[in-house]
């Protein structure tokens, strides 16, 4: 490898440390404290400490190192990852019924992510701010207001983009991981006996000794791997090699040293269980560590916020969420986006969670169900890809699936015990998002089918218009068409009511491909249907935002000249009426009407100059 390539790999690896590992990297703030806080019926005992440390270490090895970094990250769509990408890949070579099942799984996984992102900023920032209690116990009443202030500032800067701030993420997180390692190593040197917990037999002994209680305690252990989905979801930003290199060279050693350092401290000073992370540090270092922890948790929260923006754009482009305003905050990086509606809805949800739960330890009970539920679905979808797309041996794939589920299912089941104490929160949010996504998709399909029931052939209409043309007026008219070979409603209504047609007519269809990006060479396809009619199909990936001005610039390069300010864009605006339905479908219909009313209008969605748009209304019963 050349020197330049090595430097580039080092830079990307450093950047991956700053973005990908923020969530899992701040887990030491609260994980071991929750494991040994006494809620499971045992205190800081040697066997319990060794058992939890062994479980945490081997979860990091099996779930993160083996399952995600080695297996799941093999499943990419043009380098992109994430649960919806996995859903798309898994459904490519399967039957229609199987594809429907896989789509439902993918949507549930995506919905769980929305439930998780409400909790991550709250628990991360609160855990860091709670370090104030070690410095000055009388400041404990300031934890909630300070957490809200920090997160308010974070959500307010989202509209300015994170490009400049992002440059600071990597060095701050690298410093964070080095401090984690240093604090842990210092404690381990003072009590090296704790390293015996690396032996997986301590995990086995933990289950044998504590039986049912040990199973329930898995709900706390899983806190050590929250954020693992980010490794796969952010694969498109950094690539597989940098993410893997960052994990094995920096993140895994640092996390292991810190967890075992906390364990060594607790074996000598059980009273440190009130906050073992901050008590690892010497007294003089508490305030700098508190500041660094606050910065690290803000970075972890930023990564989650950026993730929900990306997931939302993907869901919108794939037709599972209604169109909404998406702002690009960087001219250089297409992945840096800001969605105002999502930003402020997430902010208010996070503030409500902080005020309601008050302590990170209370919020820990809500964490885990969404994470482990997504892990189960990822196992099923990724092994489906291995069998159907990679054509691996079915017995080998079955063995892999069983191995994954033997870990994922117990973790998910253990977290169900948290349902009444907070686990209902991400589950409820996930269910709400699942209902919204499936409602939009199914009702949108019903609407389009209803609109296209007129049965007229596009070819027949064009032939008729060319043979017996109506009054033709100068200029170019563009009619947005949702599907090929379907007559746009706006065209029918223009002919019916205005009885005129422009000299040149373009039927424009914007299509979302099953890929993150579409090369400019394949962006536009032009077909002349008659002397005065053209069909233009513009293809975009689900990580791209359609732009009509760009489309016609490409058309001009291919011989179909079209000036935006001399062109009229005709669009149909549907006024929807609910027909007779069963009560449950009527409720879904009302939800769809609400979503439709608040959806971004097509001119804004496709960046068409407002003064060039003509909307023709039509009433449709669904």
UniProtKB/Swiss-Prot annotation:
Localization, UniProt: Cell inner membrane
Record key words, sorted: Cell inner membrane, Cell membrane, Ion transport, Membrane, Potassium, Potassium transport, Symport, Transmembrane, Transmembrane helix, Transport
GO molecular function, one term: potassium ion transmembrane transporter activity
Cellular component per GO, a single term: plasma membrane
Membrane disposition: Multi-pass membrane protein
Family annotation (InterPro entries): K+_transporter (IPR003855), K_trans_C (IPR053952), K_trans_N (IPR053951), Kup (IPR023051)
Transmembrane segments: 9-29, 49-69, 103-123, 137-157, 165-185, 213-233, 247-267, 276-296, 337-357, 363-383, 396-416, 419-439
Coiled-coil ranges per UniProt: none
The keyword NADP is assigned to this record: no
Keyword tRNA processing: no
Reactions catalysed: K(+)(in) + H(+)(in) = K(+)(out) + H(+)(out)
Pfam families: K_trans, K_trans_C
Family of the protein in this entry: Belongs to the HAK/KUP transporter (TC 2.A.72) family.
PANTHER family: LOW AFFINITY POTASSIUM TRANSPORT SYSTEM PROTEIN KUP, OSMOTIC STRESS POTASSIUM TRANSPORTER
NCBIfam families recorded: kup, PRK10745.1
Function: Responsible for the low-affinity transport of potassium into the cell. Likely operates as a K(+):H(+) symporter.
UniProt protein name: Low affinity potassium transport system protein Kup
Biological source species: Citrobacter koseri (strain ATCC BAA-895 / CDC 4225-83 / SGSC4696)
Upper lineage: Bacteria, Pseudomonadati, Pseudomonadota, Gammaproteobacteria, Enterobacterales
Gene coding for it: kup
